[in-house]
Each structure stands twice: as C-alpha cells, then as structure tokens.
Amino acid sequence: MIPVVKAKLLEGKKGLIVGIANENSIAWGCAKAFRAFGAELAVTYLNDKAKKYVEPLARELEAAILMPLDVRTPGQMEAVFERIAKDWGKLDFVVHSIAFSPRDALQGRVVDVSREGFLTTMEVSCWTFIRMAHLAEPLMRKGGTLFTMTYYGS
C-alpha cells in the first residue's frame, strides 16, 4: 500500500495511468506520487503477459480500475474511457507514458526508417495521446490535466 501524505492535495481527484509495465516504469513513479497525495487511480496493462507484473502494483496503489489497454487494438481505448465514465463519471488527469517503435526502426540511420515503421512509431507514441485527450475531454467538464512523457531518443 502506498502511504498517503497528510496534505491530501489530490483527494477526490481521479486519474488514468497508462504505461505501467513494472516497478521501473516512469508511469509507476507518477502513479505512486499521485496516490500519495490522495488521488484515486485507474491503471491499464498492455496484455496478459504484462498483467502479472502490473496487477500487484495496481493493488499497492489500491487502484479502483485495472483494465487491459493495447492502443493498437480497436475499441480498447474507448472501453477504458467508457468504464471510467460508468464508474466515476469524471476524470481529472491522464498520464500517457507509452511508446513503441518496431525493432527495425530503432536500428541504423533515421533517414533509412521505413514509412511503415515511422507511422507505427507515431501512432503508438504520439497519436494515442491525442486520441486519449479526445476521449477524456467529455469527462473533464471542470477542466483537467493531460501528461505525456518523452524520451531522449525522440
């Protein structure tokens, strides 16, 4: 269990954390900090293989929602936001901490990357943030905050 600090600055706030893979994930550090200040969290995991690593962390966070989210699978992003709407009716913040690039796009010179590799990288690493913002907007009736991470390789 994550200890909650006495000054619960985020008490009553509800947030979605996307990108926890294990205890070394930047998203995990963000989630611990948000929880420590009293936020209630929804956490996603990539697939069944990742679930075995993320589920114990979600328990430690006392996450109210734990759902699969492969952003390249049609309907999964929508399902996450539908569940948040059903359970909470609102959303105060989203942490988008995911990125992906095909192996061949990570090797060699950037000018040699294939169109397909580049588009896959942009879809997962960038466009999904925009899509999540679109899906979050109706739940952020009083405003909200969107966080995304970058990497020095970008």
Question: Model-found features: residue ranges?
Answer:
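Residue-level detector of anion-binding/catalytic polar loops
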Residues: 40, 64, 90
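Canonical Rossmann dinucleotide-binding motif of NAD(H)/NADP(H)-dependent dehydrogenases/reductases
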Residues: 7-43
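Conserved mid-core segment of classical short-chain dehydrogenase/reductases
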Residues: 58-59, 67-78, 82-119
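Catalytic loop of short-chain dehydrogenase/reductase
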Residues: 19-28, 32, 99-138, 142-154
